[in-house]
Swiss-Prot record:
This is Tetraacyldisaccharide 4'-kinase. Belongs to the LpxK family. It catalyses: a lipid A disaccharide + ATP = a lipid IVA + ADP + H(+). Its EC number is 2.7.1.130. It comes from Syntrophotalea carbinolica (strain DSM 2380 / NBRC 103641 / GraBd1). One of its GO terms (biological process) is lipid A biosynthetic process.
Length: 357
């Protein structure tokens, strides 16, 4: 991540501190107010019917957030796919996609028999969901309504998960699941570009259930939101998998020098988790979210390799490394999701999922 990007993220998360930061913030703040007003009007026009929203013939559950950047959404979507499958429902995920398969065409990543596109065509998150859940339907569609319609009418979806759908009001939904980072739910509280929020905090009134993600064990209290809240933690598995599929215990790596890298929005939490499992990290590298791992990335990794014995990264990053020749062994560590309030999410969603129109 560039110094400019790091500076902006600091400003958007913690707010201005220095005179220069206050000057920049004062310039961005009116733009944020304007953007927030536009988003309020947009939501109002959908609510009163001036803008049309596509209504599917099956239950649609939106999984989204209020801010840009990571809230740990992919593990939650993965969890919901598995839950729908446990209810014997044919489930589809419809995603806008990111940096995969340029163009506006609808792409079926998985039709229920594993991925049928490569990660470059599908995008990292849809491809990872398809690999983890080969019996699910995964579609990337810049026009989400088109993707939902295709999943239901052509592929037999009985439940649709609208990935990153909170602001995508052109598709009607039966349930809005809103994810918030437990440690920084609203950043500095301002709307883009003055902060990280896609909409004003008042938009949370549309939410049906709020999930505080990445909760530390000592978390006290909760975010001020207008609805029920559940808490979850993202926990590293006790084993790591290299790029050839060989499994090794994290304990085996603890005595070696590790170099951790990640192209996710909030890599610091991942790095801390690795260290909490006893790994010694001599260096950490933060690439941009959804990084493509190009020649520049290869040069950075080659240089970093001088100070370590192995690389370690996330599942989402590992799927994009097949084309690279790395100078050290590289391991990925899977994440699993643990809800603090066992059963509350399922209790809310079960009647929605079971209600076929």
């Amino acid at each position: 991540m560039t110094k400019l990007a790091l500076f902006y993220r600091h400003l958007a998360v913690k707010g201005p501190c220095s005179p220069l930061e206050w000057l920049i913030f004062a310039f961005l703040l009116p733009l944020g107010w304007l953007y927030g007003a536009v988003m309020r009007l947009r939501a109002l026009f959908y609510r009163i019917g001036w803008f049309d929203a596509y209504c599917a013939d099956v239950p649609v559950i939106s999984v989204g957030n209020l801010s840009v950047g990571g809230t740990g959404k992919t593990p939650v979507v993965d969890y919901l796919i598995r839950y729908c499958r446990s209810l014997d429902k044919r489930v589809a995920v419809v995603s806008r996609g990111y940096a995969g398969g340029k163009g506006a065409a609808l792409r079926v990543v998985c039709a229920g028999q594993g991925p049928i596109l490569d990660v470059q065509q599908a995008g990292d998150e849809p491809w990872l969901l398809a690999r983890r859940n080969p019996a699910a339907i995964v579609i990337v569609a810049p026009h989400r309504a088109q993707g939902v319609r295709h999943a239901v009418e052509n592929l037999g979806a009985e439940v649709v998960l609208l990935d990153d759908g909170f602001q995508h009001l052109a598709v009607s939904r039966d349930f809005d699941l809103v994810l918030l980072d437990a440690l920084r739910p609203f950043g500095n509280g301002q709307v883009l570009p003055a902060g990280l929020l896609r909409e004003p905090v008042s938009a949370l009134r549309r939410g049906d259930l709020f999930v505080l993600t990445r909760c530390p064990e000592d978390l006290a209290g909760t975010a001020d939101v207008p609805g029920p809240v559940v808490h979850c933690r993202h926990i590293l598995e006790e084993s790591a998998v290299d790029l050839d599929g060989e499994v090794r215990s994290l304990r085996e790596l603890a005595g070696l020098r590790g170099i951790a890298f990640a192209g996710i929005a909030e890599p610091e939490g991942f790095f801390r988790e690795l260290q909490s499992h006893g790994l010694t990290l001599t260096r950490t590298l933060h690439f941009s979210d959804h990084a493509a791992y190009d020649e520049r990335a290869a040069i950075l990794l080659k240089d970093a390799a001088k100070s370590g014995d192995y690389f370690i990264t996330t599942e989402k990053d590992a799927v994009k490394l097949a084309h690279m020749t790395l100078p050290l062994p590289c391991f990925q560590v899977p994440l699993r999701l643990m809800f603090v309030e066992t059963g509350q999410l399922e209790q809310k969603l079960s009647p929605i999922i079971s209600n076929q129109r």
